[in-house]
Amino acid sequence: MKFIYPGSFDPITNGHLDIINKITSIVTGDNPVSVLVMNSDTKKHMFAHEQRIEMVKKTLKQHMPLFNVEGFDGNINDYIESQWPKYDVIIVRGLRNNTDFDYEMMYETFTRRFSAQTIYMTPSPENIFVSSSLVRNLINTGADYDDLVPWI
Protein backbone atom coordinates (compact mmCIF):
# COMPACT_ATOMS: atom_id res chain seq x y z
CA MET A 1 0.00 0.00 0.00
CA LYS A 2 1.33 3.43 -0.96
CA PHE A 3 0.32 6.60 0.90
CA ILE A 4 0.51 9.94 -0.89
CA TYR A 5 -0.19 13.44 0.40
CA PRO A 6 -0.71 15.78 -2.57
CA GLY A 7 -1.06 19.54 -2.39
CA SER A 8 0.17 22.77 -3.87
CA PHE A 9 1.82 23.76 -0.55
CA ASP A 10 1.86 27.43 -1.63
CA PRO A 11 3.26 27.80 1.01
CA ILE A 12 3.42 24.83 3.35
CA THR A 13 1.67 25.76 6.61
CA ASN A 14 1.41 24.48 10.16
CA GLY A 15 -1.90 22.96 9.08
CA HIS A 16 -0.09 20.83 6.48
CA LEU A 17 2.57 19.92 9.05
CA ASP A 18 -0.15 18.96 11.51
CA ILE A 19 -1.58 16.47 8.98
CA ILE A 20 1.93 15.21 8.17
CA ASN A 21 2.57 14.57 11.87
CA LYS A 22 -0.68 12.59 12.05
CA ILE A 23 0.37 10.55 9.01
CA THR A 24 3.50 9.45 10.88
CA SER A 25 1.30 7.58 13.34
CA ILE A 26 -0.08 5.26 10.63
CA VAL A 27 2.90 4.56 8.37
CA THR A 28 6.22 2.80 8.71
CA GLY A 29 9.62 3.57 7.25
CA ASP A 30 9.31 0.49 5.02
CA ASN A 31 6.99 2.36 2.70
CA PRO A 32 7.59 6.11 2.85
CA VAL A 33 4.75 8.53 2.20
CA SER A 34 5.15 10.53 -0.99
CA VAL A 35 4.38 14.20 -0.46
CA LEU A 36 3.45 15.42 -3.93
CA VAL A 37 3.94 19.10 -4.61
CA MET A 38 1.57 19.81 -7.47
CA ASN A 39 2.18 22.35 -10.18
CA SER A 40 -0.78 23.56 -12.18
CA ASP A 41 -0.97 25.97 -15.08
CA THR A 42 -4.55 26.77 -14.06
CA LYS A 43 -3.51 28.02 -10.60
CA LYS A 44 -1.56 31.19 -9.97
CA HIS A 45 1.12 30.38 -7.41
CA MET A 46 2.91 32.85 -5.15
CA PHE A 47 5.99 30.63 -4.93
CA ALA A 48 7.61 28.85 -7.87
CA HIS A 49 7.27 25.07 -8.04
CA GLU A 50 10.93 24.46 -7.12
CA GLN A 51 10.65 26.87 -4.16
CA ARG A 52 7.62 25.01 -2.84
CA ILE A 53 9.39 21.65 -3.21
CA GLU A 54 12.38 23.01 -1.25
CA MET A 55 10.11 24.47 1.48
CA VAL A 56 8.46 21.09 1.94
CA LYS A 57 11.81 19.25 1.95
CA LYS A 58 13.21 21.61 4.61
CA THR A 59 10.10 21.24 6.72
CA LEU A 60 10.10 17.44 6.50
CA LYS A 61 13.83 16.97 7.08
CA GLN A 62 13.15 15.81 10.65
CA HIS A 63 10.67 13.19 9.39
CA MET A 64 12.85 11.56 6.76
CA PRO A 65 12.92 8.66 5.85
CA LEU A 66 9.17 8.41 6.50
CA PHE A 67 8.55 10.87 3.66
CA ASN A 68 9.90 11.62 0.25
CA VAL A 69 9.03 14.84 -1.54
CA GLU A 70 8.30 14.90 -5.24
CA GLY A 71 7.09 17.56 -7.61
CA PHE A 72 4.79 16.85 -10.51
CA ASP A 73 2.88 18.63 -13.24
CA GLY A 74 -0.50 17.68 -14.53
CA ASN A 75 -3.17 15.24 -13.49
CA ILE A 76 -2.87 13.43 -10.15
CA ASN A 77 -4.40 10.23 -11.50
CA ASP A 78 -2.00 10.07 -14.44
CA TYR A 79 0.89 10.65 -12.06
CA ILE A 80 -0.28 7.92 -9.67
CA GLU A 81 -0.62 5.39 -12.49
CA SER A 82 2.80 6.26 -13.93
CA GLN A 83 4.58 5.98 -10.56
CA TRP A 84 2.78 3.20 -8.70
CA PRO A 85 0.85 1.03 -11.16
CA LYS A 86 1.01 -2.09 -9.00
CA TYR A 87 0.28 -0.45 -5.67
CA ASP A 88 -2.95 0.17 -3.91
CA VAL A 89 -2.70 3.92 -3.42
CA ILE A 90 -4.15 5.80 -0.46
CA ILE A 91 -4.50 9.56 -0.92
CA VAL A 92 -4.35 11.51 2.34
CA ARG A 93 -6.27 14.80 2.41
CA GLY A 94 -6.85 17.34 5.16
CA LEU A 95 -10.33 18.60 6.03
CA ARG A 96 -10.90 21.84 7.95
CA ASN A 97 -14.50 22.79 7.24
CA ASN A 98 -17.60 22.26 5.07
CA THR A 99 -16.02 24.04 2.11
CA ASP A 100 -13.10 21.59 2.19
CA PHE A 101 -15.55 18.70 2.54
CA ASP A 102 -17.55 19.72 -0.55
CA TYR A 103 -14.38 20.14 -2.61
CA GLU A 104 -12.94 16.84 -1.39
CA MET A 105 -16.10 14.90 -2.24
CA MET A 106 -15.84 16.17 -5.82
CA TYR A 107 -12.11 15.40 -5.88
CA GLU A 108 -12.63 11.88 -4.51
CA THR A 109 -15.28 11.14 -7.13
CA PHE A 110 -12.64 11.91 -9.74
CA THR A 111 -9.81 9.91 -8.13
CA ARG A 112 -11.98 6.92 -7.22
CA ARG A 113 -12.40 6.17 -10.92
CA PHE A 114 -8.71 5.33 -10.90
CA SER A 115 -9.00 2.96 -7.92
CA ALA A 116 -7.21 5.25 -5.47
CA GLN A 117 -8.77 5.41 -2.02
CA THR A 118 -8.86 8.60 0.04
CA ILE A 119 -8.56 9.04 3.79
CA TYR A 120 -9.28 12.34 5.51
CA MET A 121 -7.57 13.81 8.52
CA THR A 122 -8.52 16.91 10.44
CA PRO A 123 -5.92 19.28 11.85
CA SER A 124 -5.68 20.08 15.53
CA PRO A 125 -7.98 22.88 16.76
CA GLU A 126 -5.16 25.45 16.73
CA ASN A 127 -4.64 24.82 12.99
CA ILE A 128 -8.24 24.46 11.86
CA PHE A 129 -8.30 27.93 10.26
CA VAL A 130 -4.76 27.89 8.86
CA SER A 131 -4.59 27.79 5.07
CA SER A 132 -2.09 28.65 2.37
CA SER A 133 -4.59 31.24 1.06
CA LEU A 134 -4.63 32.97 4.44
CA VAL A 135 -0.83 32.99 4.60
CA ARG A 136 -0.56 34.41 1.07
CA ASN A 137 -3.05 37.17 1.98
CA LEU A 138 -1.04 38.02 5.09
CA ILE A 139 2.20 38.10 3.08
CA ASN A 140 0.60 40.37 0.47
CA THR A 141 -0.62 42.82 3.11
CA GLY A 142 2.61 42.80 5.11
CA ALA A 143 0.92 41.29 8.16
CA ASP A 144 2.61 38.86 10.54
CA TYR A 145 2.25 35.20 9.59
CA ASP A 146 5.22 33.66 11.42
CA ASP A 147 3.08 31.49 13.70
CA LEU A 148 1.25 29.92 10.72
CA VAL A 149 4.23 28.47 8.83
CA PRO A 150 6.97 26.06 9.93
CA TRP A 151 9.76 27.28 7.64
CA ILE A 152 10.50 30.77 8.99
Task: List each language-model region with its residue ranges.
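Nucleotidyltransferase catalytic core that binds NTPs
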Residues: 1-152
